[in-house]
Amino acid sequence: MPAPSHRRRARLGLAVGVTLSLLAAARGGHAAGLYFSDRGVRPMGRAGAFVAGADDLGAIWYNPAGLADAKTSALVDFSWLRFNAEYTRALRIVDADDVVRVVRSPTVEGSSPVIPFPTIAGSYNFGERREFTVAGGVFAPYAAIATYPETVDGRPSPARYALGSFEGSALIFGGGFFAYKPTEQLRFGIGLGALVGQYQSTVTFSASPPDRLLAAPEQPEYDAESRFRVGPIFAPTGSFGATWVPLRFLRVGASFQLPMVVSSSTRFDVRLPTASVFDGGRITGRDAHVRFTLPHILRAGVEVRPTDELRIEAAYVREFWSIHESIDMTPEGVAIEGIRGLPPRVPIPAIKFPRNFQDSDSFRIGSEYTFDLAGYKLDLRAGVSHETSAIPRAYLSLLTIDMDKTVLSLGGGLHVGEHWRLDAMYAHLFASSVTVSPEEARIPRVNPLPGNAPLEAVNGGQYSASADLVGVGVNYIF
């Protein structure tokens, strides 16, 4: 005897839900655009305008040619990105009678834990004219790692279908660099490195039978929690740059970073819903493969030094996110088994999740002024930048939250003797609010089973975010 309709639909929802959990693993690997802010305590004191004027170990990210002026030195700094986000979900539902409804959820707030993002680097300067410099370093991207509550106003959080926790995630960029200064007017640099680590998260999916399997009311007893780990990640890249000093007071710099291809295994666990219709069901297989591409980056800057004490740089950065068209996820032997009313084994197919990102532009102005105070040399830094989002509004979601943003920054450096420099920085990131109407939202429900209801976008709603960046560091010249 065939299973009742609602039971059959719920069991089909389980297959869809497992697919969603795998897809969440793939999407999560992107880590909210990988970073919400540019990096480095001294560079961000200048709002990231540190391309032509790069002259210490902070150059490993901005322009490796600047390492030619880093001398033999060591740098350690730590920054905390205090990130806050709010999301009010709006879901467009077309029920079985073709009635269109928009369901709005309570506003959910997410915040980042206290994570000190490090930079650790060292350089060695050598040659008859000290024209060669080798350097190495490791650092963490300034990722907007937010955790959202499980409940809002006593009800399950609407964010539970986007993301939960990122505990256990660790992504580090490491690399080696070489710089050459043939004359006082020219500097060249090259670097080879890789993004390494692992990404962990929890995501809840719904196999609720009413309104096309996964739509409202999304009863909690039909929720299933998935935990996944993407890794080990090893995504190599390279960079090269040049700095030209045609006049004593003028520096022109540019650099280019190659794209990174993340191609990694994924392992996941799914806790089935507690509803009785899932009794007897099981999931076989735990492995999948995720692949996507992170962008190449072009940086250019012009720095003027009207006096020996004052530096002012205007910089431009273009990140070619249009290369990030999709995330491809291939399950490896994952299937649903033991569900009455379904075939004995329902395999989960490969998925191509559309991203359709766009190139982003950043315009930056930063300054640095050096003066003597009570027998110590002190650097004061300030800057402002504006960056456009790489995420088209229709594809914005909590898993990859990014908007147009403006950064205001202040920083300073205290020189102690001839060898030590102590740095500090504060920046505030003003991000614009974005409303994604349910009609324009384009992140779909993923349904691998033919014959089910039409796909419905799930990322509609209002998004807002802001962040503070605080950092301290020390630089030592041998």
Where are these regions (language model features)?
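Bacterial N-terminal signal peptides
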Residues: 13-24
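N-terminal, post-signal peptide beta-strand-biased segments of exported outer-membrane/organellar beta-barrel
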Residues: 28-134, 138-140, 359, 427, ...
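Intrinsically disordered, low-complexity segments
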Residues: 3, 19, 376-379
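Serine/proline-rich low-complexity intrinsically disordered segments, especially terminal tails, linkers
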Residues: 7, 23-26, 107
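N-terminal secretory signal peptides that target proteins for export/translocation
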Residues: 1-9
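Outer-membrane beta-barrel porins/channels
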Residues: 30-43, 115-478
